């Protein structure tokens, strides 16, 4: 039986939402909705070590938009991951608390290795059996995954 799922990826510059239907028998995802908002969550983190109030507000506003879309599709499961900007910020708990207030669940703040693994899996999911390498240069330093 197919199942609807939602995934939110909150990076340094953008927040992406995917709502999909999963066919577990064939391991196939069918996109139902895809959204992306430029929020610049990591703006200034390298200089100040903190997520700015403006960046937190932009990101929270994008997540509020996503809540409406998620509600229309009623997924059985949802997951949100947050990457380097959240991981590196001194006030990351403030971000986690805001997300929990908006979405009802806390984001998973993933390690750099997990971020690379998830990114590689997403980029290569439909290219099975082909030797590949993926380079990610945002934010610095650049990471390469094979």
State what each model feature region is.
Residues 144-146:
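Acidic, divalent-metal-coordinating active-site segment for phosphoryl/phosphodiester hydrolysis
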Residues 1-10, 18-138:
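Nucleotide/phosphate-binding catalytic cleft detector across ATP-hydrolyzing
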Residues 141:
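Rossmann-fold dinucleotide-binding core
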